[in-house]
Amino acid sequence: MLEGMVRKQTEKQAQTLDSWLEKHDREVPFPEGVRLHGDQDYMGDGKPCHRMDVYEPELNSKEGPVLVNFHGGGFLLGKKQVNRLFCADMCLHGFTVFCPEYPLVPEVGIFDIFRDLTVAVNRAGEEAAARGQDGVCLCGDSAGAYLCVYLAAMRENPAMAEAAGVSPVVPRIRALGLISGMFYTCRLDSIGMFLPDMLYGKGWRKRPFRPYTDPEYTARAGNLPPSFLVTARGDFLRHYSRRFYRAISRDSAAHCLLDIQGDRPLSHAFAAMLPETPEARDANGQMAAFLLRHC
């Protein structure tokens, strides 16, 4: 019954997102100076959920560092097109950006998503290696930020990868950009009350991956790379970013939190979904500079 209710609500939200995206793309043009190679099949199976867009600067297209971006949507909805302008903006900061689609819950669970995105990150890593670069950076918003943390942590923690039944990504993860992260999935809140069974599978509390459902434990166990977190007044998951930053900062001073307390409230994932706004331009500029320092 709960899953049926979630599906129905998700369908409505997906329709709203599509309407917003169509309007936003009409109003905000795609920037000049960016070359888009769309819908590359990174799994080789022809499925729409396994397509990936690649954004390259028109000038010096094979010289910049490689960045992989994961869209948000709470694992239930979302699509790579929502982050189209964000990826183009990061491309203008000098990155070649890989933005993969991935299958969504409840059709699949989180471990399936991990496996598929591992292939996408490895593809991006091959491009980085061809450029003589040692690894890639990851960035994501909301659920995409969670995916950055977990894929990076599993690379450094074989026991965690084994508990997930996932082969770790091959390239070194040099740094993370985490926008409005949906880091916590099992708390007693509006997310944790319904999502865990669909995300981790029924009976997840008795399985080896359970300790890693706590992102703070995951970050400590996985030796998280330098991370730049973005949130703001108005972000309904602002407390997640603040709490997660406090947790990871106990172990390393390499992390940074940009917490905007401006004159107006900003929406969740504003930096990814509205990159043309002044606040997002500033946030993304700071994040790009942080990532470039670690590439």
Where are these predicted regions, by residue range?
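Alpha/beta-hydrolase superfamily serine-hydrolase fold, recognizing
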Residues: 1-295
